[in-house]
Swiss-Prot record:
Keywords: Calcium, Cell adhesion, Cell membrane, Glycoprotein, Membrane, Repeat, Signal, Transmembrane, Transmembrane helix. PANTHER family: CADHERIN-87A, PROTOCADHERIN-11 X-LINKED-RELATED. It comes from Pan troglodytes. The gene is PCDH11X. InterPro entries: Cadherin-like_dom, Cadherin-like_sf, Cadherin_CS, Cadherin_N, Protocadherin, Protocadherin/Cadherin-CA. Residues 24-812 are extracellular. This is Protocadherin-11 X-linked. SMART domains: CA (SM00112). It is found in: Cell membrane. Residues 834-1347 are cytoplasmic. Its main location: membrane. Residues 26-139, 140-249, 250-355, 362-466, 467-570, 571-673, 677-795 form the Cadherin domain. Potential calcium-dependent cell-adhesion protein. Gene3D superfamilies: Cadherins.
Amino acid sequence: MDLLSGTYIFAVLLACVVFHSGAQEKNYTIREEMPENVLIGDLLKDLNLSLIPNKSLTTAMQFKLVYKTGDVPLIRIEEDTGEIFTTGARIDREKLCAGIPRDEHCFYEVEVAILPDEIFRLVKIRFLIEDINDNAPLFPATVINISIPENSAINSKYTLPAAVDPDVGTNGVQNYELIKSQNIFGLDVIETPEGDKMPQLIVQKELDREEKDTYVMKVKVEDGGFPQRSSTAILQVSVTDTNDNHPVFKETEIEVSIPENAPVGTSVTQLHATDADIGENAKIHFSFSNLVSNIARRLFHLNATTGLITIKEPLDREETPNHKLLVLASDGGLMPARAMVLVNVTDVNDNVPSIDIRYIVNPVNDTVVLSENIPLNTKIALITVTDKDADHNGRVTCFTDHEIPFRLRPVFSNQFLLETAAYLDYESTKEYAIKLLAADAGKPPLNQSAMLFIKVKDENDNAPVFTQSFVTVSIPENNSPGIQLTKVSATDADSGPNAEINYLLGPDAPPEFSLDRRTGMLTVVKKLDREKEDKYLFTILAKDNGVPPLTSNVTVFVSIIDQNDNSPVFTHNEYNFYVPENLPRHGTVGLITVTDPDYGDNSAVTLSILDENDDFTIDSQTGVIRPNISFDREKQESYTFYVKAEDGGRVSRSSSAKVTINVVDVNDNKPVFIVPPSNYSYELVLPSTNPGTVVFQVMAVDNDTGMNAEVRYSIVGGNTRDLFAIDQETGNITLMEKCDVTDLGLHRVLVKANDLGQPDSLFSVVIVNLFVNESVTNATLINELVRKSTEAPVTPNTEIADVSSPTSDYVKILVAAVAGTITVVVVIFITAVVRCRQAPHLKAAQKNKQNSEWATPNPENRQMIMMKKRKKKKKHSPKNLLLNFVTIEETKADDVDSDGNRVTLDLPIDLEEQTMGKYNWVTTPTTFKPDSPDLARHYKSASPQPAFQIQPETPLNSKHHIIQELPLDNTFVACDSISKCSSSSSDPYSVSDCGYPVTTFEVPVSVHTRPPMKEVVRSCTPMKESTTMEIWIHPQPQRKSEGKVAGKSQRRVTFHLPEGSQESSSDGGLGDHDAGSLTSTSHGLPLGYPQEEYFDRATPSNRTEGDGNSDPESTFIPGLKKAAEITVQPTVEEASDNCTQECLIYGHSDACWMPASLDHSSSSQAQASALCHSPPLSQASTQHHSPPVTQTIALCHSPPVTQTIALCHSPPPIQVSALHHSPPLVQATALHHSPPSAQASALCYSPPLAQAAAISHSSPLPQVIALHRSQAQSSVSLQQGWVQGADGLCSVDQGVQGSATSQFYTMSERLHPSDDSIKVIPLTTFTPRQQARPSRGDSPVMEEHPL
């Protein structure tokens, strides 16, 4: 489409929009007194008519000013261009709008007709006449006289006559000014409610009539126009005698209404005013104010004496509808009273409507000549009817007296367009005399008439006219050909050959019809089918024989009546529906759609199920099938029935269709793993396995069918190094890379199995535990590792965004868990690094302390000593708690006074069975000074604990680790060629290369006597009530160089343990660091200590995180039963024989106490003896005299257990020299005759293991395997001097006698972080086999040791 065509279409559309209403209004603003030929506006542009091309019009566009004959318009318009100009007529606003209120706008209106007829519109143009300042304000008189009494108070105000300005707005009165007032008077201007400005004279000084009785000055008034206009008047003020009172109107505002036809002399209103004066001053005079208009003064009369207002001349509402009468009441004084009377003139139907004919088509001798072929709606004249009356009296209608081919169409209020309503025909009517009638709505109505003459010019312009403008016929379908439908006819107003008509089918007529040219008969020539075509719409033409011929047409609508000649049709011959088996009863199965080409009742189809099938129902109207049963695919997979469709014809037709309903499976089952059967199974993967080898196959089944049962596998967690891959269809897990050392251990691979169900896939996950190792030597440990590992979250793969659920909530939970795990690991790592850096170096000054004496016990400390402990509540309650009480008794035999008295120190110990392994020994401080020796080694042991029973009286809230502090002169640590520690130093604290900074705590200590026992009792079965074992130890004699008298001392250790701890151990191995915490029943450590966090892989020169001494977070479980006792009291001879080289160098355990100073040369002399509560040794290895042992673990609080052999209760089940739960143990541990390294041993409850052999006089075994505690063995009591060995009972040498002093001590809680002191509590010492002296009042007699 080119630009010109687009412009044309746009112009036509715009013209349709512009002229759709038939009339428009356009407003312009002009100023009064404008000169001639001033351009006001351009209708062609202002009405957007310039977009209409002239070539689309029959004639050129024309603008014609429509005005009343005889009027002189104030504007003119160019007919070709539409430009509006002023004429020579004066535009005077004050004259044109003299009768309207001053606050209303002044308009001048004209009408413009836009021709030709195809775009004809009548435009009413309203000119808003703006006021100019062409009038000056004037006072009502040039001299204004006013009287003021001489007693007027200062600031008294007197109203002056106001000036009048015909202009409005700012051009009106704006300001008053007093000239030459001599400062006696001032002027103020107030504004009345009507908006008028009133001047008031103000008395500014006292007046004295005798001094001066007259003042003359000028008053000036100004308007606000530009240029400003003003006028002046002389103001003469007379000073009069005093007039005390002023008149007062009874009513200051009065509003009355009076009809405009009221006769002259009719009373309008009566004013009343009063004056309190008497005499002449009381006489009141009424008058109109000078603000009252001249018209009001002419129409109304005011009685000056009575105040009665009457009609002076006839009123005319059409001239002035209301009048404002300002009445003044004066008593001769200078302060008249004011009252406003508003007179509303009501309308009376006293005006006849007037008819104003303004021709659009120019008349010739007052007659309009029209051609008979002019188009319809040709505009002839604008008829304006007016009535000066108001309301319904001024509402006028206009009409013609009889039927004529013309009509009046309203365009504006009381304005009508006279236009042709039909084609004119010269042959029928040559002239028209149109009588126009105008009538108002008054009662009675008044009317007016006017005549308008039209003459018709003859032309051949009449076309045939059909008698019907629209022809409608109906015929049933399946008709016989040749049936006549209807006959059309047309007439022609012309005469002669122009009136002869021929009938023709229009070009849109279908071939099924034919038309007789002369008669106009319409006939059907073919059989009709409503289903193919239900209606026909075409035209019939009528053509005359004139020259040129004229034609007309009529539209024919043929409707085909339906017959029931079609049966209902199903959209499918057979319907197959698939429904889920969980579809509820009365749910929607499907929809049967049926169509019927017929119409009405013939197409109203009703559906039903044949054969009385009660399992399903069908909606007879909508075709929705619903079940009356619940589906079960396993019972019946499909249902078949027939549906009947029947229409509603008089002779109904029907059809049927087969319906099959198939019950399909629903994805309501998750895949279930059958391999592995649970998260606790595992598979061994050899490190030598080649990449690409299938190491395991997972298998999951889905109880659904089809795609819902198709399972796909994927690894979604645990495979952080991508060591394994899985086949998503077979479930084969393949090793992707060659395993190295870092890959050894347990791998928890999280495998996800999801089905292919739609729309939602279901899935399950399983943990596949792949144990990368050469063999599985300890299945119990692996099972325990697997069980423990299930409590920790599996690390997700980096590429897996969500392994548990597709929802964002599980993603958030997973991210939070991973972040928390990483945070904990980082904190533990940082803490371990800081603690390791705090390990003190060796202090050489310890060498000077080897010959130090023990601290002298204080015999006065006879009461129980309470020690503070840390109060830290655990976040998670442990599942089981084991409460142990260690009672250390000491008998002094050297002093006669203390004979038979023993001091017993009860130390409560908490043990967690499963949660203890979670305690971090690295981050938990111990009770030792940073540079003190590692005393924890003396109280940690790798020996398993026997089965103990928890008794109700077991105290609550007790710690599960008890550390005995050494005396200031520490004889428990010595230095030689092997040890790096010194036992002699000026420092009051002994120094160990392996010490850790610790936090102290206190425990309660009770002192009581207990008789010694001289036999060794061992229990190999769970203890029912209580079991007591006493081991007497005879320490080695002191070196002669020390010059000390060897005293005899014995040490008694009593264990109070809770009931229920007699579970047997299933595995005696040491825990792997990566294996997770184990239960206390494993007996890897004494008293069921969890092993995984207490010990770690380490070299002999490094401490591990297991070097803590106490667990401040231990808790107790209420409901404990009576405690059992195990008392170990060796004799002096036994103790001396059982002291080993390690006891002489590194200190003594409870079974082996020695004097303070020991000779280094004795380290090669001592032999270790083992007192145990377990069966004999299971194996002994080849003897080696070179010590391969890299590290030795002692009972209770010892360093890492990674390379340790423990006595009692836990022999290795398979391997001889290594415990299965600790990977580095393969290099462990042949026992030897030389002392171990600096970190080798600690104080023990049994002899140190470094040189332990079968307890006999034979050479020590090269390897000693921890004795295994068996549930099947019974309790055996051994006589003094005999123990159970590998080959039976072994003799213990009792010939060595020694003297040793023992000392009790406690650990007090630090009062300040810098306080590293260890408080030593002196207690009474005793000698073994010395009888205790009688006590006084149940309290043993204590005496201080002579040393």
